[in-house]
Amino acid sequence: MLYVITLVTVLAGLLHYYFTRNFDYWKKRNVAGPKPIPFFGNLKDSALRRKPQVMVYKSIYDEFPNEKVVGIYRMTTPSVLLRDLDIIKHVPTKDFEPFADRGVEFSLDGLGANIFHADGDRWRSLRNRFTPLFTSGKLKTMLPLMSQVGDKFINTSDEVSQTKSEQSIHDLVQIFTITNIAACAFGLNLDENMLKTLQDLDKYIFTVNYSGEFDMLYPGILKKFNGSIFPKVVKQFFDKLTKDIFEMRKGTSSCQKDMIDSIQELRQQKTVDLWRKHDNEDVKPLELTDGVISAQMFIFYAAGYETSATTMTYLFYELAKNPDIQDKLIAEIDEVLSRHDGNITYECLGEMTFLGRVFDETLRKYPVGDFTQRNAKTDYVFPGTDITIKKGQTIIVSTWGIQNDPKYYPNPEKFDPERFNPENIKNRHPCAYLPFSAGPRNCLGLRFAKWQIEVCVVKVLSKYRVEPSNKSSGEFKFDPMRLFVLPKGGIFVNIVRR
């Protein structure tokens, strides 16, 4: 018995040492930070699914208001959380090269070849090839298609609001974003079965799992052992979807001017030259297989569908709470549409300046992109400090913390679109607003997301008003199981005909 007790004690001691061996790292370097907990570091609440990870980082941001750089532990791995905006400006822009990688790579066979998760030369090459798909010129051709999807969505809204005016707004606008992404990105006109299939995929893509924590404990292990952060069913679906779409198109263009037309042109090239540091460098080109294209289609869908749906959920919620802002927005929509014969065009959206401010303020208060993560490719001393981040370590920028900091946004809980009038923008630090990150690794689909949301908002508010619901009158309790931050149980509003 004594032998067993001794063995258990020794094993417990070894495990404790192993999972706390790095916890004096920042203390030795005189870098302030929260006290880590064995095994979990500073992420106990998110690892145990008590809070979303983004809210854990916001809490750390709030806890150290006088620090430029905060030393944290993502599980057992030393990392930093940046608070100083001048330092933050260096990371994605001025000193981009040392921080070009996100550090969230995983198996290329598990959709890891997508442009968001790819790092290094692979990311550069994909970015160069796929950026032209999101130019203003390309997106302008999609606006009529977005408008058609919006008209169908209004018919759906009519049906559901007649049955019950009180609606889970997230569930409702998801119908628009799924249908719009399917039309604009895949050239598909969804039937009810396909819509249901895509809705069922939601839980596999946007429910958090423990692969992230595992990769923090052992950085790079997912890529090394061909692991993925998504279940096989997701890859199988997008592989089949890609194959079916290209077989259906048979190399011909559609009359819709969707994204598949542009992807087909890339597909015919067979390969993409990887980025070279030197002209004479011998680098094997990236083969544009259907698997690589499938990974891009997956990320276009995942990023374009759920982030927009979540943003619109908060936008309509705030309009319901602030009827004066809603009145002003409706007046602008009515006036501008009357000048354009009721048609939504590029010029029409450009004239809706207050709509743009409402969009920006929504993402200020609720930055669904959550936080920025970058992996150091070299040792780097943060400007204005003597703090060094080592090669392979991770930096975190709490977008939610910055954009809800009263230092930059007085009374941050107030929803105030005038924070984004030209004068206020001019007087604010550029890194005080980072919903799409910044620099070369910012969100590639920024314009698409904005236009998608604006088209839907214009369609809805030209016919309806949104009013508060008693179901969503209290303080939000965010769902720790959701990848993008949403309250448990959703957000409800009443949709009322004007």
Curated annotation (Swiss-Prot):
EC identifiers of the protein: 1.14.14.1
Subcellular location: Endoplasmic reticulum membrane; Microsome membrane
Regulation: induction: By xanthotoxin and bergapten (linear furanocoumarins) as well as by angelicin and sphondin (angular furanocoumarins).
Signal peptide (residue range): none
Main location: endoplasmic reticulum
PROSITE patterns in UniProt: CYTOCHROME_P450
Membrane protein topology class: Peripheral membrane protein
Gene3D superfamilies, sorted: Cytochrome P450 (1.10.630.10)
Enzyme class, broadest EC rank: oxidoreductase
An annotated GO cellular component: endoplasmic reticulum membrane
Names of required cofactors: heme
Enzymatic reactions: an organic molecule + reduced [NADPH--hemoprotein reductase] + O2 = an alcohol + oxidized [NADPH--hemoprotein reductase] + H2O + H(+)
Protein function: Enables the insect to feed on furanocoumarin-producing plants and evolved as an adaptation for detoxification of xanthotoxin and other furanocoumarins.
Name the UniProt record assigns to this protein: Cytochrome P450 6B3
